[in-house]
Amino acid sequence: LPSDLRERIESRLAIIDAREQALALPHATAVRTPTFCSGCPHNTSTHVPEGSRALGGIGCHYMATFMPERRTETFTQMGGEGVPWIGQAPFTDETHIFANLGDGTYFHSGHLAIRASIAAGVNITYKILFNDAVAMTGGQAVDGTLSVPKIVAQMAAEGASKIVVVTDEPEKYEAVRSLPQMAGIEIHHRDQLDWLQKQMRDVPGCSILIYDQTCASEKRRRRKKIVDGKPGFPDPARRVIINEAVCEGCGDCSVQSSCVSVEPLQTDLGRKRRINQSSCNKDFSCLKGFCPSFVTVEGGQLRKGVSHSADVEKAAVLPPSLHELPDPQRIAITASGNRTYGILVTGVGGTGVVTIGQLLGMAAHLEGKGVSVLDMAGLAQKGGAVFSHVQIAHRPDELFSTRIATGEADLVIGCDLVVSASNDALAKMRPAVTRAIINADVAPTSDFLRDPDWTLPAEALKRNLIDATGETATEFVDATTLAASLMGDAIYSNPMLLGYAWQKGFVPLERQALERAIELNGVSVASNLEAFLWGRRIAHDREAVAEFLDPKRLAKVVELRRPYGQSDSDPAGRIDRLIGRRVAHLTAYQNAAWASRYSEWVQRVRRVEGDRIGDSGQWRLTEAVAEGLSKLMSYKDEYEVARLHSDSAFVASIRAQFEGDWSLKFHLAPPVLSRIDPNTGVPVKREFGSWMLSAMRLLAKMKFARGKWFDPFGRTLERRTERALIGEYEVLIDELLARLAPANHELAIELARLPEQIRGFGHVKESQLVKVRVQWEDGLARWHGKPSRKRREPIPIRSIQA
């Protein structure tokens, strides 16, 4: 080979080897696995009852095979759904199975699989998931005409043993009940799905369950499309919010809804939950979580962001430095022919990542440059990782690759921290070459749906990015928070990042070309242009933007608690502040005497830990007891829930989020008034109007009765257990302090933190307590140097109310 060519090859191989070696070193990682969208019908429809399993198929519902709790196995080609059971059934003791089948696949060839199962005489229930769109590939309409009545007629003609329909809107079937094919067909609400599936699995032969609920993504698209002055799909004037003060962070709302719009919120009192209003598709299944913290706002609308205030008022308060922005000195692409300029856009599917790549591509095209845009998406559009490779050259004939090679990304626009710090993205980066603009706000992954204690190693991921690009080449922007505060919707974080990168001079395109590309895209043009402008402003003068924002309107950002073991410059001061906040909290909860009892215990622990462990222990046992005892002493009974809901701060927070004519509804399961679900044995929540605020204010004033002989709520086993736990924990503290030493300090902290795991209400809290009892007993056995013993589980709590 010629020497110059050999040198280029060796140089390229050296870059590849260096990146592979860097990625081979141990480093923190996180995976953004594709999952169902917020409000997706499959969040509910793919569940099977205890003791059953299902077979997967082609469609979004295939992702149920990723989720162990759904017990969905394998998949087939289109038209083969459920057919493997024909061969398996004669050779197993299993008597029945479910099979998932999408409506598009049904129309294509899936009905032939059902015909084969009917002919074979196997016991199987096909769940035909009718969501009115080919959702996996972009929401196209199913080829041909298809409706639930037509499916019913065809399945009846094929000889199905039983046909039922499940839907989130049973009332819409009143109009078709008179059709001959619908005669005798049962229509059930989706809340009855578990009970109904238990009935269906006992039906001999091939039965059909049609689950009718419109695709969540398609609902969102249709609502945005205005037809005759109205949304193309009904958009209820209703929003779900969570009173974080009431929330226990148990995660039952995520269990019930499997919705990624239910996000973690770290607070001084632990991890809670909040609803991401920007991504919520108004499915409302989260309301089934057995928790009194859920409130719906009926009527009104979300307040617009700060930037949408009146132009005159806005101009008057906008800092002078943000009025006229200078154009940056941009990177120029010359006709050198050596290499293209590679921009890698990373993020979460369904949030507009591909759109950013398209805007860059169109802007380059408008300037007459050579450009290639390659989107790596697939199933990733459903909440997974998405990459858009944008290659820009001076002329089209200088493009030689559509994909950015290893170490060849000049700019990374990271719309999501997790995806940006993945190995696939890090491999494209190289120190002294790559610049990165990264969204520092973290969206939870699908792991959070199954693990309420899920924590992302955010700082470690940021370190990975800095190592891959160089100490000064990566900039982090709280884009989601800023977009929600400035624009009223977090969806505008991506064009905001694009504007930020452009103002920094890292995008080799004219501003006018990018703005024209946004106009040609034709979607929320004014808002996207505004977001692009705000990104430029943030890049130019971040402090001025912070001054412009009203702190009361700024979306709440709370840092995660300091990791245990990490040094603290002022541990004693931190403990003082923690105790002070908890004393104030318990005083408001009950009275000063109650708070004094708490303070005496914590100060006693502090003295003993100081004497035996010293400052080297960072007062971590004191911190654990301060948080654990506070949690047990402020158990959320009827008085406390009433106090927290009627607190003026909660109502003020709603006023800050909503405008117009709105009212509140509370979703509760109060004693006596709630019926018991015969299928689950759990009280069913009911709606109560705004008048409940007055009742709650009155009930909150009766907290003096808490624990007294005349306490009408204190006689239930649940309340007696909560009060007894306080005494048990104080006994535990005594045991820990009696033998505390450096050798068992970590075990003492582990035991002292057990109350943090006792979360939730009613049966949810009971299940957590059962697990904690086992850990408690095992930990005490280790504390006393004995083999662990399995403690008899406590008597189940029967009187359960939320």
Model-derived regions, located:
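Short beta-alpha connecting loops at secondary-structure transitions
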Residues: 69-73, 133-148, 175-185, 228-245, ...
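Active-site cofactor/cluster-binding pocket
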Residues: 146-149, 162, 296, 301-345, ...
